[in-house]
Amino acid sequence: MIGTLSGIIEEVQDTSIILAVGGVGYIVHVSYRTLINCKRGDSIKLYIETYVNRDNVPQLYGFTDTEEQNCLKMLIKVSGINYRTALAILDRLTPDQLFSAIVNEDKAALKVGGVGAKLINRIFTELTPLVQKLEFNIMDKRGPSVEDSDALSALLSLGYEKTRVLNALEKVGVSHNLSDTVRFALKELSK
């Protein structure tokens, strides 16, 4: 099992890169967001997911951060979603956008090639409890307060995605009064 690969990008293809590591060139499938930042000759470290297809051919999927990698792991748990489909979803959505689409049951956001209405409904059914639990765990680390709940509502009303707001509130740390909490969270969200 491969956990990470660090090397030099030899070639950038349509949906993958060839990563030279110790004299071996690995074909690594990456999301569009990763692909647009890849340039031949650049050094890169990727977190790797390995999948062996029906023909017993191993395929490597690489991610620049563990958040996107964990989203892929979560998506492939849904019956009917394979690695390629999960990567197509991650091509279109950031992890925050994915969580938001699941929690808000935003069918249009999840509409990508190979993902029909039945599969989208299955994603909502199977992943909504998991995503809500993840959001609860973020708030639970600090112990939510009335100010946190009010700050969450205020920031959501400004149009920020719930997952981003929860992450910002987590980074703000110790609860402040409401106006300070919102101000510090807005600074965090603007980064």
Swiss-Prot record:
Keyword tags: Cytoplasm, DNA damage, DNA recombination, DNA repair, DNA-binding
Region Domain I, residue ranges: 1-64
Presence of keyword Disulfide bond: no
Single biological process term from Gene Ontology: DNA recombination
Span list, region Flexible linker: 146-149
GO MF annotation: an example: four-way junction DNA binding
Gene3D superfamilies: 5' to 3' exonuclease, C-terminal subdomain, Nucleic acid-binding proteins
Domain-level remarks: Has three domains with a flexible linker between the domains II and III and assumes an 'L' shape. Domain III is highly mobile and contacts RuvB.
Protein name: Holliday junction branch migration complex subunit RuvA
Gene: ruvA
